[in-house]
């Protein structure tokens, strides 16, 4: 059992299916660590990735071959017995991942919709395969990871459309909202929260949200002014200048009603009907700002929000599973949260008439196949 230090008392079950949060404040827990392996991983990130981020931030106006990152990660082969299937969406693809022993995505049980990070400009199912494979096992669930369109060629709105299409694909398989957990890391945390808010317009409420080292606010200033900008093992301050420029350029290319796409800030639209939310974040990274700000806004609105802070780790240290013990521990905790959040949902497939081919909604989103996967 992991040890931790709670900044405030923890409810016996933490955040689960409850729509309320204890006395309107988020639960925040500081985990033990870092281990020697965690320290070494953070040092390696500081010595290699952070300098590359610094150089890349100066070269951001140039067309950088960022798609190579996910392509190169194809060498990370899935573990023995892991099943990966490519799913075609209207404007993108996704990969359905099942760890050994996990049932097919047939509308029964639970399912995780995973939105990868990478500053909206890079990465994909291959770069995040270790996290997704492990999460499928710990959550005892299929995981659908979306290879959404990236900026600056496409806009954030287009990326969110792809995530929404993936959610509709799961609904077409027979999953009900209370069987679906939205999860994302870094920029994928932004997409997970924004998707949950878009689903509110359809009166759909997923079982829960999981955000790992999440970027929840596009505004760069608060992060650049945060004390952790000096201790972050991955992001230099200038990286957020580059990200802001990329996002603006992408929005300008996507005209909506004759004007550039509006930039959407999810934290400005928090409502009490959002699902319970679990956030894992490093205590040394600058995105601790977004994690704590987001949890505070959720809790103030009456949404159960829990933050687990991991001291001394690199951004998205979960990628280092199983080499870093805290990475495995974090993913195991997330898997337990997902199982708890979906424990009350019925495990039988449901009527799919709203989503069958030929219905107005299916026609507008594209028809999806129904074969077992």
From Swiss-Prot:
PANTHER family for the chain: AB HYDROLASE SUPERFAMILY PROTEIN C4A8.06C, ACETYL-HYDROLASE LIPR-RELATED
Temperature dependence as stated in the record: Optimum temperature is 35 degrees Celsius.
Species the sequence originates in: Mycobacterium tuberculosis (strain ATCC 25618 / H37Rv)
SUPFAM superfamilies: alpha/beta-Hydrolases (SSF53474)
Broad class of enzyme this protein falls into: hydrolase
Keywords: Cell wall, Hydrolase, Secreted, Serine esterase, Stress response
Propeptide segments, given as residue ranges: 1-7
Catalytic activity: a carboxylic ester + H2O = an alcohol + a carboxylate + H(+); a 1,2-diacyl-sn-glycero-3-phosphocholine + H2O = phosphocholine + a 1,2-diacyl-sn-glycerol + H(+)
Active site residues of this protein: 186, 285, 315
pH dependence: Optimum pH is 7.5.
UniProt name for this protein: Carboxylesterase/phospholipase LipF
Result of altering residue 285 to A: Loss of activity
Motif, Involved in the stabilization of the negatively charged intermediate by the formation of the oxyanion hole: chain positions: 116-118
Stated role: Hydrolyzes short-chain esters. Shows maximal activity with triacetin and p-nitrophenyl acetate. Has no enzyme activity on triacylglycerides or p-nitrophenyl esters (p-NP) with long fatty acids (tricaprin, p-NP caprylate, or p-NP caprate); experiments performed with enzyme missing the first 97 residues. Has phospholipase C activity, making 1,2-DAG phosphocholine; experiments performed with enzyme missing the first 97 residues.
EC number: 3.1.1.1, 3.1.4.3
Domain of life: Bacteria
Record-linked InterPro entries: AB_hydrolase_3, AB_hydrolase_fold, GDXG_lipolytic_enzyme, Lipase_GDXG_put_SER_AS
């Amino acid at each position: 059992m992991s040890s931790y230090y709670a900044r405030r008392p923890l409810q016996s079950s933490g955040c689960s299916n409850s729509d309320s949060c204890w006395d309107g404040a988020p639960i925040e827990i500081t985990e033990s660590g870092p281990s020697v392996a965690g320290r070494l991983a953070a040092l390696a990130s500081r010595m290699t990735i952070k300098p590359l981020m610094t150089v890349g931030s100066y070269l951001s106006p140039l067309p950088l071959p960022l798609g190579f990152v996910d392509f190169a990660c194809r060498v990370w082969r899935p573990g023995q017995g892991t099943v990966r299937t490519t799913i075609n969406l209207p404007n993108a693809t996704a990969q359905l991942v099942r760890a050994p022993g996990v049932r097919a995505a047939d509308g029964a049980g639970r399912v995780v919709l995973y939105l990868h990070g990478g500053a909206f400009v890079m990465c994909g199912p291959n770069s995040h395969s270790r996290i997704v494979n492990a999460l499928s096992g710990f959550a005892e669930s299929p995981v659908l990871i979306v290879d959404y369109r990236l900026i600056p060629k496409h806009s954030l709105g287009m990326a969110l459309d792809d995530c929404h299409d993936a959610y509709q694909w799961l609904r077409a398989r027979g999953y009900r909202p209370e069987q679906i957990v939205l999860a994302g890391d870094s920029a994928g945390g932004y997409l997970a929260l924004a998707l949950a808010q878009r689903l509110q317009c359809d009166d759909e409420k997923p079982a829960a949200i999981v955000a790992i080292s999440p970027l929840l606010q596009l505004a760069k200033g608060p992060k650049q002014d945060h004390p952790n900008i000096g201790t972050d093992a991955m992001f230099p301050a200038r990286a957020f200048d580059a990200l802001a420029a990329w996002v603006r350029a992408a929005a300008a290319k996507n005209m909506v009603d004759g004007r550039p796409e509006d930039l959407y800030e999810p934290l400005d639209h928090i409502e009490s009907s959002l699902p319970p939310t679990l956030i894992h974040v490093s205590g040394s990274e600058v995105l601790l700002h977004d994690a704590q700000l987001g949890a505070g806004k959720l809790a103030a609105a009456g949404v159960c929000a829990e933050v687990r802070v991991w001291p001394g780790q690199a951004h998205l240290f979960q990628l280092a599973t199983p080499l870093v013990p805290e990475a495995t521990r974090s993913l195991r905790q997330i898997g337990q949260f997902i199982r708890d959040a979906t424990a009350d949902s019925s495990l039988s497939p449901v009527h799919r008439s709203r989503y069958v081919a030929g219905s107005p909604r299916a026609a507008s989103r594209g028809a999806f196949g129904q074969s077992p996967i």
